Amino acid sequence: MDRRIFGLENEYGVTCVFRGQRRLSPDEVARYLFRRVVSWGRSSNVFLKNGARLYLDVGSHPEYATPECDSVPDLVTHDKAGERILEGLLVEAERRLREEGIAGDIHLFKNNTDSAGNSYGCHENYLVGRHGEFSKLADVLVPFLVSRQILCGAGKVLQTPRGAVYCISQRAEHIWESVSSATTRSRPIINTRDEPHADAERFRRLHVIVGDSNMSETTMLLKLGATDLVLRMIEAGVMLRDMTLENPIRAIREVSHDMTCQRRIKLANGREVSALDIQWEYHSKAVEFVERRGGDGDEVAKRVLDLWGRTLLAIETDDLELVAREIDWVTKYVLIERFRHKHGLSLASPRVAELDLKYHDIHRDRGLYYRMERAGLVERVTRDLDVFEAKSRPPQTTRARLRGEFIKRAQEKRRDFTVDWVHLKLNDQAQRTVLCKDPFRSVDDRVDKLIASM
């Protein structure tokens, strides 16, 4: 599939503190955050005029699901637009707190674990064809996804009985199955629940829930772009070496705990390889694949392959500074190590834990990642203007455009409506509904007529 539909869902951690002490419960904070949303949407589960979905997930976690995008850079832009939308809700909620005489700062964290050991996710969505065996697709992807954390982990200081350790992935400790239809109870690498949000006879939605949430735009580009390339190779029938893991769940933890990425993990055929070996194998095949298809014009693939290769080389040569501006877990590790050495702290210090958390704060004046971005210490994929526009403008080349235009007009005309990923409905006497099953289709006469009738 040369043109693919992508989507990202990010759950956010939330807290409210005053002078270091927790001030409000997550439920109370969530109510303040979503008060403005509920006032116009009459619900804490709404679709926005940029085509995205914003809602409160289990455990009072705000979740933002991007609109459908057909390019990885677009998806990165719309994911960042989600951060800005939530930051706006945060600022408004803090203003309300002050008006009501409640002292405290609200923090939204784009991470995957809290201090109590709970985990919340970043879910990636890739549209794939219905033809072919989904189980075979999953079999090839699992070793790639288990080892992919060395490219796109968010990093975490983990407190263990043997002391504090720096792990590559936040999510690795919370994954319990390779493939499953559950998302919360067993937390698989790939979720197999068959909800395509499209024509079920033509498409299937690959739902990957093993990845970390990323602050870094370049890490996000690599995570999504490398996965897309592997999918394209599988779809094109490229012969990939059998890398089936003997125990993927043990392997994902072993990889996360080994910053050298050299620890041997056992394959089902008895061979032993490292996470680096697995990633080099996929990378070399992807380079051949793009070259063979005359990929000179595919600038995104070239950028992905370049960063993929440089990241593996930086790890292999133990020269992480090579990608310290581009790879989340490396950026944060370098930041923590400099802070520790400057202040003479151990990895177990509460000040290090605070720094670890502040990296993920999406408030641009408080979050450490954004302070680094402002200082020019990290690389970008997006432009600020594009992110700002994406807060209210849907992608123009996918179904999201139809949804966004419908919502915008209905709100302007103060019409009651209901939408989901595939339906647009006017709640009038006629209950007119348009079913949009093709996520690639951005123009539809039926939708135009529905909009014109308002």
Swiss-Prot record:
Q: Does the keyword Magnesium apply?
A: yes
Q: Which residues bind Mg(2+)?
A: 9, 55, 63
Q: In which pathway does it act?
A: Protein degradation; proteasomal Pup-dependent pathway; Protein modification; protein pupylation
Active-site residues per Swiss-Prot or TrEMBL entry: 57 (proton acceptor)
What catalytic activity is recorded?
A: ATP + [prokaryotic ubiquitin-like protein]-L-glutamate + [protein]-L-lysine = ADP + phosphate + N(6)-([prokaryotic ubiquitin-like protein]-gamma-L-glutamyl)-[protein]-L-lysine
Which InterPro entries does the annotation name? Pup_ligase, Pup_ligase/deamidase
Its Gene Ontology biological processes? modification-dependent protein catabolic process; proteasomal protein catabolic process; protein pupylation
Entry EC no(s)? 6.3.1.19
Q: Which UniProt keywords apply?
A: ATP-binding, Ligase, Magnesium, Metal-binding, Nucleotide-binding, Ubl conjugation pathway
The protein's GO terms of the molecular function aspect are: ATP binding; ligase activity, forming carbon-nitrogen bonds; magnesium ion binding; ubiquitin-like protein transferase activity
Q: Does this entry carry the keyword ATP-binding?
A: yes
Enzyme class (EC, first level): ligase
> What family is reported?
Belongs to the Pup ligase/Pup deamidase family. Pup-conjugating enzyme subfamily.
Please share what else the UniProt entry notes about this protein: The reaction mechanism probably proceeds via the activation of Pup by phosphorylation of its C-terminal glutamate, which is then subject to nucleophilic attack by the substrate lysine, resulting in an isopeptide bond and the release of phosphate as a good leaving group.
The protein, known as: Pup--protein ligase
Organism in which the protein naturally occurs? Frankia casuarinae (strain DSM 45818 / CECT 9043 / HFP020203 / CcI3)
